[in-house]
């Protein structure tokens, strides 16, 4: 594949605690595709498809420090549009033609994080908690295809997201020691509205040298 892209980024802050970041971009990609059909595996199907991509993202952060507590409120909006060009395969009698297709990706998320900073004998102990809600606003997309040998019969396939929103919960702590050792651990649970979920436990240890 061959890809080119350009992005413009800007950051604005009203004061030292409120930040808004945004970017907008465009990309173009050429993909060389190969498909093998079980009925004729010795003659693979090949094709080339171009994709134009438009995308933007806006992020908001508000930080508040009070005593040993740091609170962060955040939100984000993402939008992307991929315009897939039509193309035809070649190679054998099972070759397909794919029509133009638009793939839209749209989502919004917001949440909060609270961290407590406690000085200990050899450094700092920083426990934290985080909650984030994610709403997937991506619409369905329809793919249309036909056999090159039979262009009058069209087959449709609807591309759907498997869930529309999720809730992420995270607890953890960082341990920064004066002798440069750094420890971090966290446990995270992602709950999706389709009754699916993911659990993650992470440990990180580092020391510069």
Label each region the model flagged:
Residues 1-209:
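Membrane translocator/pore-forming domains, dominated by Gram-negative outer-membrane beta-barrels
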